[in-house]
Amino acid sequence: MNGLKLHGISRSFGDHKVLQDVDFGVRRGEIVGFIGGNGAGKTTTMRLILGMLNPTGGYITWDGEPISTENRRSIGYMPEERGLYPQMSVKDQIVHFALLEGKTRGQAKEKADELIATLGLSGREKTLIQDLSLGNQQRVQLAVSLVGNPELLVLDEPFSGLDPLAVDTMAGLIQQQAAQGVGILFSSHQLELVERLCDRVCVLDRGRVMADGAVSELQDTDQTRWELKFDRPAGEFVAELSLVASFHIEFKMSNQSSVFITVDGRDATIPQDVLEIAARFGGMRSIEPVQRSLGALLSQDYISSGRGITPAREAELESAGQTR
């Protein structure tokens, strides 16, 4: 395949197997969501792609050729921990990283001007990073990842901490890069965004790929999901229902008047127990079948309750020389 491909990648830290037979890829122009619980191995996988770690087993290719220091220069990286200098101006920040990429000062200034215009930072060239909003700091961080004209962007939690307007802006910028043929791999715990943006999703759990495909493909299961909407918070309804339920119940604290029921069987009918308890509770405004959310898919089908290795623990083991 064109672009990035991981072939049976494994990685251990001491006796702890962090990744086991990880196999997936990112094509040019494709947006791939990389999701899983804390400790699933996402950060380790990204570090392997970037060459910060070597795999215990398996190999990585770029356009069908073994990945190397040279073709890794085609990868732009935006870490979760932002690496910006707070007392440097926006333009100087971008110029600095462009110089590190090997550009001349003239080329670096030209690239900075181009990215400032492209990413909506015009008028803020001389503003210090510490004086920018978090959303604009994220734009600068994205600009830094683009100074080398990458063919692949690896973004670790790019939406973390952003308000809704800044999220929409960042999402639009990512889509813009994909439309220009750049492959995008990003991790996020904001699953609604993953559903909205991604062509494909790769689900990692305890170091193994549990699913890899379009969200619509993952949602095409032999189960039916129903949404019940009430005219008031439905906590008491859920409490009574949970005593007799043989099906999955979702009750979101952010929207306490909606309850989601998932039952086995394609096009299955709503269980009679649910209707009877809803009638006793009263105030049901509607009931209709809906697609299972990505969050429901993960919690029910793909993500275990066990924890893997966290980035902090990974760093401890690595610094102690226990990696292999």
Question: Where are the model-predicted features located?
Answer:
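Catalytic Walker B motif of ABC-type/P-loop ATPase nucleotide-binding domains
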Residues: L153-E157
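ABC ATPase "signature
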Residues: D212-G213
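Conserved ABC ATPase "signature" region
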Residues: V95, L99, Q107-R124
